Amino acid sequence: MSAKTLYEKLVESHTIRELDNEGHVLLYIDRSILNEYTSPQAFSGLRERGRTVRHPDTFLLNIDHVNPTRSQRDDLMTDPGGQLQVDYFRENAADFGITLFDVLDPRQGIEHVVAHEQGLVMPGMVIAAGDSHTTTYGAFGALGFGIGTSEIEHLLATQTLVYRKLKTMRVSVQGELPFACSAKDIVLELLERIGADGATGYAIEFVGEAISALSVEGRMTLCNMAVEAGARGAIIAPDKKVFDYIYGKPQMPVGELWQQALLEWSQLSSDADAVFDKTVAINCHDLEPKVTWGISPDQTGSITGRVPFPEQETNPLKRLALEKALHYMGLTAGMLLKDIRISHAFIGSCTNGRIEDLRAVAKVLEGRKIASHVRGIIVPGSTMVRRQAEEEGLAKIFIAAGFEWRQSGCSMCLAMNEDVLSPGDRCASGTNRNFPGRQGAGARTHLMSPAMVAAAAVAGHLVDVRSLLQAGE
């Protein structure tokens, strides 16, 4: 028997049958979480064809993309189109017998936060959902990937998908993570190195002492943003940290079933002599806090660096891309990244809206005020995260510093609700994408860790968070 990677083992264990000699298989899917934005046409297709949902109990419907995050929670959408999506979503849940986490549900939140809170993600699972950041679930030793609307319809009806097997990439991250650096900095470093298409056609497995040292929530950030390199899957072998994190969650097995599950989950790893199609090595020793300066997550650099000079790029297509990015972002080649002035600071999203992210933000903000010209918004990843942040006293720190403390939702990660930037606004953002218009038409986005966002809000411009913290914090 040949040695296998963890990715190959997960795909093999869920393969119903091989479909051809080109790597296509019929894949069984354990779980799916659907949102109000990408699923409506799929349910319409079921109705038109007179089909039912094969296993409603393996699905969760969750409202997160278009809902308001105003401090006083309500379920009225300001956009008529958004209201229509939500109303139809509720109808689909009722008609097809699928559990719905509605806007006012105490379990509501961003799908990739809610799923692990409710114990819906378990090691060894294969999970598909109508959102590209489903790769997040790799932090638990599961294979997660995003699918399109037609695939959602097929999944609802059959519990299966036609799936093309991916190549494998091993990303080894060694060394101790430096002071004030985080998982966000690791993944931005990876993106800078391999590019926005460097993992296209691959499933990534993250390994190494730096990965083992990360918390489970840090690993979620890492796997969440692997898709920004083109990866259609990102996995970290589960360990005791994962098992402790998921223990006692609502949908987790209990008693003897839990012990049996642990025995199985403990075997989930790549074979020692497994061969990967590609290997990337990162040493954390010289890693610094990272920020993006351009219009793609791979257009990034260390906060101590400068905006690049396009004329120094020998590849004409890459040079053109640099020029386009600088024009849209309104930046001058050679300027210090820490001199970039911001108008907004946003903390939240499925990348960095969890409780550990908010604790890191509170360390920076405690006893400080944000700059008078900056509007700061913090949106917890779920209603449960919001409650916990309030119980820990974090919310009081945010409010005292001048941040708006909101209800949960996708919010300003994407311009699909009422939290939208105006043309020319510049935002330090703890999200995952900085494409033109992502946070609003003509708006400019700089990605960074939540702590870096908090530091920028205080300074009024991009700044090295290390200057605001004491080593050891």
Curated annotation (Swiss-Prot):
Q: Where does [4Fe-4S] cluster bind?
A: C350, C410, C413
Pfam families recorded for this chain? Aconitase
Per the annotation, how and in what number is the cofactor bound?
Binds 1 [4Fe-4S] cluster per subunit.
Q: Which EC number(s) does UniProt give?
A: 4.2.1.33
The record, for InterPro entries, names: 3-IsopropMal_deHydase_lsu, Acnase/IPM_dHydase_lsu_aba_1/3, Acoase/IPM_deHydtase_lsu_aba, Aconitase_4Fe-4S_BS, Aconitase_4Fe-4S_dom, IPM_dehydratase_rel_enz, IPMI_cat
Q: What keywords is this UniProt entry annotated with?
A: 4Fe-4S, Amino-acid biosynthesis, Branched-chain amino acid biosynthesis, Iron, Iron-sulfur, Leucine biosynthesis, Lyase, Metal-binding
Question: Does Lyase count among this protein's keywords?
Answer: yes
- Part of which pathway? Amino-acid biosynthesis; L-leucine biosynthesis; L-leucine from 3-methyl-2-oxobutanoate: step 2/4
**Domain of life assignment:** Bacteria
Q: Which cofactor does it need?
A: [4Fe-4S] cluster
Q: Which Gene3D superfamilies does the record associate with it? A: Aconitase, domain 3 (3.30.499.10)
UniProt GO molecular function: 3-isopropylmalate dehydratase activity; 4 iron, 4 sulfur cluster binding; metal ion binding
What processes in GO biological process is this protein linked to?
A: L-leucine biosynthetic process
Its subunit composition reads: Heterodimer of LeuC and LeuD.
Q: Which PANTHER family match?
A: 3-ISOPROPYLMALATE DEHYDRATASE (PTHR43822:SF9), HOMOACONITASE, MITOCHONDRIAL-RELATED (PTHR43822)
NCBIfam families (alphabetical): leuC (TIGR00170), PRK05478.1 (NF004016), PRK12466.1 (NF009116)
Q: Which HAMAP family match?
A: LeuC_type1 (MF_01026)
**Protein name, UniProt field:** 3-isopropylmalate dehydratase large subunit 2
